Amino acid sequence: MVQFKLSTASLLALASYAAAHGYVSSIQADGQTYPGADPHNPNPESPGWQAENTDLGFVEPSAFSTPAIACHKNARAPPAHATVQAGSTIKLTWNTWPESHHGPVLDYIAPCNGDCSSASAGSLNFVKIAEKGLISGSNPGFWAADELIQNGNSWEVTIPANLAPGKYVLRHEIIALHSAGNPNGAQAYPQCINLEVTGGGSATPSGQPATSFYSPNDPGILFNLYQSFDSYPIPGPAVWSG
């Protein structure tokens, strides 16, 4: 009888495929709560982009050069917007997030240059407004995604105070690294939300398309969690200074 032995890392990675992945199910902005984009039950009142991710799956590194990396697979802009004042904080709550899916949490914003309901994911130019990666430890360490779980599967992001009024798309993303030690193993979970930003200043970001954010061999994408390490290079562009 042939016997196979798997490492702890391999077992964790395999187990993760059976875990339920999540999506942003609730958006709180300026005292209002909006429904997120449920992949199985679209809600016309949601400012979240509806994508073809009914498997609650991910965008893999081989697709990072396609529009799927912007707002998930074949994402479509909704007519609704969440209203938020520049400088205030938005709370994004996921319906669930697996404990095995350690990794960074990143937030971007892109101007729609008009109404966001007619925007396409591939045409948006984003700037990064927040990022958080490794917090402490290694093998696998404590990560931003773990902090999200500790906070009731929620994450807060502050809209830049100097952002010019207008309509924008907020891109919120977790990159799960539990399989990222293997080529094409990282898992990106981008979520997009239409915003109408009020108040603020006069800064309008120029940004870049999401297809230029990451490459499959970036050190923060091809990264082995299950080893000793002192730091983690957060992928993507630098945080926008305004």
From Swiss-Prot:
Enzyme class, broadest EC rank: oxidoreductase
Span list, region Disordered: 31-53
Disulfide bonds: 71-192, 112-116
InterPro entries: AA9, AA9_LPMO
Signal peptide: 1-20
Biotechnology note: Lignocellulose is the most abundant polymeric composite on Earth and is a recalcitrant but promising renewable substrate for industrial biotechnology applications. Together with cellobiose dehydrogenases (CDHs) an enzymatic system capable of oxidative cellulose cleavage is formed, which increases the efficiency of cellulases and put LPMOs at focus of biofuel research.
An example Gene Ontology molecular-function term: monooxygenase activity
Cofactor: Cu(2+)
Induction: Expression is up-regulated during growth on wheat bran compared to that on glucose. Expression is also highly up-regulated on beechwood xylan as the sole carbon source.
Description of its domains: Contains a small loop in a region where a large loop has been proposed to govern specificity towards oligosaccharides. The presence of the small loop leads to a considerably flatter and more open surface that is likely to enable the broad specificity of the enzyme.
Protein name: AA9 family lytic polysaccharide monooxygenase F
Gene symbol of the encoding locus: LPMO9F
